[in-house]
């Protein structure tokens, strides 16, 4: 099997999915998940009234192990769409994402649009068959959600070094007409074992803009990261400003060890987000507090742009350390949770949008 050439058609349409917020706001796991120990409570349905999502196109199951050119597909990682893969000539491990061949344009369009950037993951190779499309990505060394869940609060120099990379990835996407919509800590993965270098992954669901107008109408978001304007009754909202809000939630979580807005009841959670009131943890520097407040503004037009974040004094003053220190802070109150039921997995064609992550 040969690698398929990635030439973007001149009249390629953009994909804008319409998805619902999931009823279960307490996990990110789809219905196809392993048995969990103990009862798993279900939360009441989301108070938002949204149009139902279109039925996804499911990729046929792949029998493993199977040979694809120089690769061998091993066991599935998350459901039936993501597999461990081994590049036989070099022994390098990859992650292989499998899609129906008919989704080739929608899956690859964000990567066609976006020039190379050091903090945005790209497929190392794409193989196209008659029924399936195989995209191979270098295997990461964990993600930011897992790091914060394990470490709790990160010291400011370390948080700044990591957040600078996250903001640079978002600024690059916005500069080239991509709105991420479902931005969260888990989408930033480490490329090194020391966990100092980050890349943004999973651009397949990004919205590709056709012009300078970034207005969106869908409700594609993770409840813990959703902006107040998405919860309002207004017809449209700025996709870029919504991404910046989500990045602000990520920064707060890195510095505090818990989300800025939390509640076990969806209606109360969304009420807190609409009000936009949150308490910053003690001990943060004035520049760090300033940056968080500049991102978590209720009014979208008052938030910093993604490129403006990189100019903020907190990121300019905190030089990247030679070796990132280990955090000794540990918060027991509403931390990014551990335990079963919180690992990310994907429904085929639709993300399960949980409270944690």
Curated annotation (Swiss-Prot):
Q: Where is this region: Disordered?
A: 1-63, 333-357
Does the record bear Repressor in its keywords? Answer: no
Which cellular component terms (GO) are annotated to the entry?
nucleoplasm; nucleus
Species of origin reads Bos taurus
Q: Which family does it belong to?
A: Belongs to the protein kinase superfamily. CAMK Ser/Thr protein kinase family. Tribbles subfamily.
Q: What is the lineage of its organism?
A: Eukaryota, Metazoa, Chordata, Craniata, Vertebrata
What is the stated purpose of this protein?
Inactive protein kinase which acts as a regulator of the integrated stress response (ISR), a process for adaptation to various stress. Inhibits the transcriptional activity of DDIT3/CHOP and is involved in DDIT3/CHOP-dependent cell death during ER stress. May play a role in programmed neuronal cell death but does not appear to affect non-neuronal cells. Acts as a negative feedback regulator of the ATF4-dependent transcription during the ISR: while TRIB3 expression is promoted by ATF4, TRIB3 protein interacts with ATF4 and inhibits ATF4 transcription activity.
What does the subunit section of this Swiss-Prot or TrEMBL entry state?
Interacts with AKT1, AKT2, MAP2K1 and MAP2K7. Interacts with ATF4. Interacts with DDIT3/CHOP and inhibits its interaction with EP300/P300. Interacts with APOBEC3C. Interacts (via N-terminus) with APOBEC3A. Interacts with RELA.
Per UniProt, subcellular location reads as: Nucleus
Compositional bias ranges of the Acidic residues kind: 341-350
Annotated domain remarks? The protein kinase domain is predicted to be catalytically inactive.
Q: Which UniProt keywords apply?
A: Apoptosis, Nucleus, Protein kinase inhibitor, Transcription, Transcription regulation
Q: GO molecular function: any one?
A: ubiquitin ligase activator activity
Which Pfam families does the entry mention?
Pkinase (PF00069)
Record bears the keyword Transcription: yes
Region ranges (Interaction with DDIT3/CHOP):
1-127
Example GO biological process term? negative regulation of fatty acid biosynthetic process
Please name the InterPro entries in this protein's record: Kinase-like_dom_sf, Prot_kinase_dom, Tribbles/Ser_Thr_kinase_40
Q: What sequence ranges are listed for the domain Protein kinase?
A: 68-316
What's this protein's name?
Answer: Tribbles homolog 3
Gene name in the database record: TRIB3
């Amino acid at each position: 099997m040969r690698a398929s050439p990635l030439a973007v058609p001149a009249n390629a349409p953009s994909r804008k999915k319409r998805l619902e917020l999931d009823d279960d706001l307490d996990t990110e796991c789809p219905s196809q998940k392993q048995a969990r120990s103990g009862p798993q409570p279900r939360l009441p349905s989301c108070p938002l009234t949204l149009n139902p999502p279109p039925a996804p196109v499911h990729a046929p199951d792949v029998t493993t192990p199977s040979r694809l050119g120089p690769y061998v597909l091993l066991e599935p990682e998350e459901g039936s769409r993501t597999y461990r893969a081994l590049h036989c000539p070099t022994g390098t491990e990859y992650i292989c994402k499998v899609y129906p061949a008919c989704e080739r344009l929608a899956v690859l369009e964000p990567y066609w649009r976006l020039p190379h950037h050091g903090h945005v993951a790209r497929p190392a190779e794409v193989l196209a068959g008659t029924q399936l499309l195989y995209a191979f990505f270098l295997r990461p060394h964990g993600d930011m959600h897992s790091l914060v869940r394990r470490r709790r609060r990160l010291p400011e120099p370390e948080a700044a070094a990591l957040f600078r990379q996250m903001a640079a990835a978002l600024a690059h996407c916005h500069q080239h007409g991509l709105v991420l919509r479902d931005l969260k800590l888990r989408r930033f993965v480490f490329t090194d074992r020391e966990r100092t270098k980050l890349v943004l992954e999973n651009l397949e669901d990004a919205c590709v803009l056709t012009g300078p107008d970034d207005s969106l109408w869908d409700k594609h978001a993770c409840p813990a990261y959703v902006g107040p304007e998405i919860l309002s009754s207004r017809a449209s909202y700025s996709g870029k400003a919504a991404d910046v809000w989500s990045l602000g939630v990520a920064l707060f979580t890195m510095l505090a060890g818990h989300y800025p807005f939390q509640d076990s009841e969806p209606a109360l959670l969304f009420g807190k987000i609409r009000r936009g009131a949150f308490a910053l943890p003690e001990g943060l520097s004035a520049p760090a507090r300033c940056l968080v407040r500049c991102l978590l503004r209720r009014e979208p037009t008052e938030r910093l742009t993604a490129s403006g974040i990189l100019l903020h004094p907190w990121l300019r003053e905190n030089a990247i350390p030679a070796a990132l220190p280990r955090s000794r802070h540990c918060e027991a109150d509403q931390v990014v949770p551990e335990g079963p039921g919180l690992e990310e997995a994907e429904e085929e064609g639709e993300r399960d949008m949980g409270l944690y992550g």
